[in-house]
A protein has these predicted regions:
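A general structural motif
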Residues: 67, 514-528, 681-688, 748
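Short, hydrophobic beta-strand segments
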Residues: 84-89, 239-249, 502-514, 535-541, ...
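Juxtamembrane extramembrane loops of integral membrane proteins
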Residues: 51-136, 510-516, 527-563
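Membrane-embedded transmembrane helical bundles of large multi-pass transporters/channels
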Residues: 1-55, 69-73, 248-254, 258-511, ...
Length: 994
């Protein structure tokens, strides 16, 4: 029985057009193939000349996105090159430092390949400006000290002798006591104690000299030491790092670059030369290159397995070699067309859209299988060759076109999403599917004509028919329907839970890109070890400021955040106080020290008696004080005097003269060192190693702040918390963590939105295909009033309307209206959507039961399963609509749906052998998804249709009078349906290509 809206009872413009095209192609196969060959050659040439590849992850993001515009601004100012981290591990600090020096020297010798080499912090030019790191108060103190010693600086070294210095200390203490200034008293006593300890130690051992002069440049010495060469090592000294950027960008689809290749050679050669150390590489460029290289190897291996597996399935399904070969040739031509189409529309492939070939292989071959199965079925019913091709196009052509359009629209809906990578994949895959459908009606009939036109039906293969399954469904449709629906509900429900009154998915989304990498990849393991050893991440957020003052303020705010481990910026390398506050003081100090005289060849003669008297006076003066320091100084002075008194005069002169010489040399050395760090010219970023200042200050004067996380932000929850915190300080912050977070959220939302949009569009297309023009207009126009009213009420309430909700509302109302005007056709539309909806529900349940999560690699399962499921549903329901008499799924439909699903499962399942975990997860979820849709399409849906057919066959008004076999049918299509009705099997006829 047929419904009123079956294709054969309504307008047959599309079937007639497809039949006409097929008749022309089969009558002129050589001419057709020549035209197709020229068009294919043109597509290949255009592709080879103009198609490019974009392997950067940032190419997947819409350039209009605010967060991506901030990233591009950062890249424009500071360069696109991310740091490569060379990790050196050895038994001790010396071995690690030697390896770092060797690697650094090799990198610097190849400047065309490597830039911004940071193996040591080497800023010698900053040493001469060390005073600028002191506070104004400390500088004033130094200036006062120099003011008191001005005569000594200018050459009167007699004033710095032992006796003279002792008298100065005595006068300083007397004056401080008279002024009643405890602070100055303590200062004087500390200096006396320093002199007493120094002299006492020297008298005991002339090889042990300690300077008696106060260290007025101690902070400067510290700064100078920090500014000298320093390796980047862990506290243990057994792990060190060299940071470098690659100058040569990646070439081609593999993501490899000359810089990375050479860098691996340098690391390998150095590790071989210095056998004690191990050298590895990590960093974002290395992680991405390793991922791309591994995935390319895996895809190549999977393609070989897929090709062989699909060929084997077609061989078993069609029981011969010839017809599977024709289908694969047609698919190859369509793929070349798709490449040309991609070149003309998009112009490039990215790391997501490069998978379009796998998608088209999985979906495009379906059209050829459906076409070939029906053609062979008709030939086995002794139809004439050219007539069988025309009837094939008339019977399954509508289903192929409907499936192609709905599947194409499912992908094209991705263009409405925010994620550019998904949108481009949607355009390429959507257009490619339509090209596969065109090739099915042009290339395939021409190839079949050249192959089969002189063959008798007895020499053609007999495809798989699914006889047992068809009989089971025909005999027990109610039982099969109930059992399968119950199973789908029970299993599918495992994927969801009820929490706080809302239904939530148990299947989670894993955004950690490291979990997609192959196990055992060196760069991933090094990154994890590096994080553990240093509590540092390779990922960091980037904040850009306009001035050093703003950089310091913002850096301090970042450092106060709980989730921030450390902050790096150029301001931390520069003096804390601006030159306007310190420059005059430093100029004064520099001017005084510029007069520093050399030490005299002979030092002032020493007078032991005078020295003893002065030290005795100091002893008595200190003895009058009661502080601990005074007690210590008094004790040391007493001991010193006792030692001197035991010596003969010549010995006293000799030892005290030696001490005085060492004392004057120490003062001169201290003043000289102070002079060396008193350069008054301001410290600038260019005083530092270019590898440092280029990373933190742009040529335009922008200042960069790197904010490192305390936790591992490859995981989504720590990443989101970290981003929330750093955005509280700088809402415009960017960097790889923000890019990863926003891109992962965009790709997740884009796939889900694309699936929703596609479901809405596919439903509307199916309604347009099923309902006649008059009711269709009402069906499409009536819901606009409801949607418009809902939108108006939302606006009136001050709420923003959700586009997805409005589209869903429009679709639901359209279906309800369509049910009123044409119940049977609308019911068929809903049943067509049963495989993707019920199959998807079943798929999520299996995911939950097997602990499979969605991730950025396998989210493509959503539009793919919708396309594959709708494709199966369209062919099964079209088969139902074409059937006259009691319904039973036709052998060609069973054969085609089974083969298309199995070939898709084989194609995607071949990825399970991959080492790249992203490809493994992609293959696994697609095998489960396609298998779920296959189960619903072959078992549940035919059983439901069989029940519907039995119900409608009991109504007398819908019975069709039996046709007279002696009268020819009025329509060519009736020949097909009558033949199907009168035959259950094709007959087992031998094939010449078995």
């Amino acid at each position: 029985m047929s419904s009123p809206n079956d294709s054969h009872s309504g307008s047959d413009l599309l079937p007639r057009f497809l039949a006409s095209v097929t008749q022309f192609v089969s009558s002129q196969p050589v001419v057709t193939l020549w035209i197709i060959g020229l068009f294919t050659l043109f597509s290949a040439l255009v592709t080879a000349r103009f198609l490019t590849f974009k392997t950067d992850r940032s190419d997947l993001i819409d350039s209009n996105s605010e967060f991506h515009q901030r990233w591009e601004e950062y890249v424009e100012k500071f360069g696109p090159e991310a740091d490569i981290v060379i990790v050196v591990e050895g038994p001790n600090r010396e071995a690690v430092e030697q390896a770092i020096d060797t690697v650094g020297a090799e990198l610097r010798s190849e400047s065309k390949l490597f830039g911004s080499i940071l193996d040591r912090v080497d800023s010698d030019r900053v040493v001469s400006k060390g005073l600028q790191y002191l506070t104004p108060v400390e500088l004033e103190k130094i200036e006062n000290e120099l003011d008191e010693s001005q005569e000594i600086i200018e050459g009167d070294w007699n004033l710095a002798g032992l006796n003279a210095y002792s008298r100065r200390l005595e006068q300083l203490l007397q004056y401080s006591i008279s002024q009643g200034d405890p602070a100055r008293v303590d200062t004087a006593i500390n200096r006396i104690e320093l002199l007493a300890n120094s002299l006492h130690s020297f008298l005991l051992d002339q090889n042990e000299f300690e300077s008696p002069w106060p260290q007025i440049v101690s902070r400067t010495e510290l700064v100078s030491q920090e500014a000298k060469s320093e390796y980047q090592l862990t506290p243990s000294g057994k792990m060190g790092f060299v940071v470098v950027t690659a100058q040569a960008s990646s070439n081609g689809l593999t993501g490899k670059s000359e810089s990375l290749n050479r860098l691996r050679e340098i690391c390998s050669e150095t590790a071989e030369e210095l056998s004690e150390v191990e050298i590895g590489m990590t960093g974002i460029p290395v992680l991405e290159a390793d991922e791309m290289e591994r995935s390319q190897i895996d895809m190549r291996n999977a393609s070989l397995i897929s090709f062989g597996g699909v060929g084997l399935i077609l061989l078993l399904g069609f029981r011969g070699f010839r017809h599977p070969s024709l289908a694969l040739i047609m698919l190859a031509v369509a793929l070349v067309w798709a490449l040309g189409y991609t070149t003309l529309t998009i112009g490039h492939l990215n790391i997501l859209s490069v998978s379009f070939a796998a998608i088209l292989i999985g979906l495009g071959i379906d059209f050829a299988i459906h076409y070939m199965a029906r053609y062979l079925e008709l030939r086995h019913h002794d139809e004439e060759f050219h007539r069988s091709l025309a009837l094939t196009s008339r019977s399954v052509g509508t289903g192929i076109v409907t499936a192609a359009v709905t599947t194409s629209m499912a992908f094209l809906c991705a263009t409405f999403t925010d994620f550019l990578g998904v949108a481009e994949l949607g355009v390429i895959a959507g257009g490619g599917i339509l090209l596969c459908a065109i090739a099915t009606f042009t290339v395939l009939p021409a190839l079949i004509t050249l192959s089969d036109q002189n063959l008798s039906p007895q020499r053609l293969p007999t495809p798989f028919q699914g006889t047992l399954l068809r009989k089971m469904i025909r005999r027990f449709p109610a039982l099969v329907t109930i059992l399968t629906l119950v199973a789908i509900v029970i299993v599918g429900a495992q994927g969801f839970r009820l929490a706080d009154g809302e239904i939530e998915s148990i299947v989670e989304y894993d955004s950690n890109l490291l979990n997609l990498q192959a196990e055992g990849v060196e760069s991933v393991e090094l990154q994890e070890r590096l994080f553990q050893e240093t509590d540092g991440s390779l990922l960091y957020a980037v904040s850009i400021s306009d001035s050093i003052e703003e950089t310091r303020i913002r850096g301090e705010k970042f450092q106060q955040l709980d989730l921030v481990a450390r902050v790096e910026d150029m301001a931390s390398y520069l003096p804390r106080f601006p030159a306007s506050e310190t420059n005059l003081l430093i100029q004064s100090i520099h001017l005084r020290l510029s007069r520093l005289a050399d030490l005299p060849e002979t030092f002032p003669e020493i007078n032991p008696l005078a020295v003893g008297q002065t030290l005795e006076s100091l002893h008595n003066l200190v003895q009058s004080q009661t502080s601990p320091s005074a007690d210590e100084a008094e004790t040391r002075l007493d001991e010193t005097l006792d030692i001197i008194s035991t010596m003969e005069l010549p010995q006293q002169v000799e030892i005290l003269s030696a001490y005085q010489g060492a004392m004057l040399s120490a003062l001169h050395a201290q003043l000289k060192k102070l002079k060396e760090v008193s350069d008054p010219s301001p410290v600038t970023p260019k005083d530092f190693d270019p590898a440092i200042h280029r990373r933190f200050v742009s040529d335009e004067g922008d200042w960069l702040i790197r904010v490192y996380p305390k936790e591992d932000i490859w995981e989504e929850k720590p990443l989101e918390a970290f981003i929330d915190q750093v955005r509280s300080v700088d809402p415009l912050i960017t960097g790889t963590p923000i890019q990863n977070f926003e891109a992962a959220r965009q790709i997740r939302n884009s796939y889900f939105d694309a699936a929703i949009y596609a479901l809405v569009v596919v439903t509307l297309i199916l309604l347009i295909d099923a309902i006649s023009l008059g009711p269709l207009c009402v069906t499409l126009i009536a819901p606009l009033a409801v949607v418009g009213f809902t939108h108006f009420m939302s606006q009136h309430a001050g709420e923003e309307s959700n586009i997805a909700h409005l589209l869903a509302l429009y679709t639901i109302v359209a279906i309800l209206v369509a049910f009123v005007f044409d119940f049977e056709s609308t019911r068929n539309v809903i049943l067509t959507l049963l495989p993707p909806i019920a199959g998807g529900f079943l798929m999520f349940g299996i995911f939950a039961m097997t602990n499979i999560d969605l991730n950025p690699a396998n989210l493509i399962v959503l539009p793919l399963i919708l396309g594959i499921g709708v494709d199966d549903g369209v062919h099964v329901t079209h088969d139902f609509r074409l059937t006259r008499g009691p319904y039973e799924t036709s052998p060609s439909t069973i054969n085609a749906v089974t083969l298309t699903s199995l070939t898709s499962m084989m194609g995607f399942g071949s990825m399970l052998v991959a080492a790249h975990q992203g490809l493994v997860s992609l293959g696994l979820v697609l095998v489960i998804g396609v298998g779920s849709c296959l189960f619903v399409s072959l078992v549940t849906l035919p059983a439901i249709l069989t029940l519907i057919d039995r119900g409608r066959s009991q109504k007398p008004e819908k019975q069709v009078p039996p046709q007279k076999t002696e009268e020819p049918p009025e329509d060519e299509e009736d020949v097909v349906t009558i033949a199907f009705q009168n035959s259950e099997t094709f007959g087992d006829k031998p094939s010449d290509d078995q």
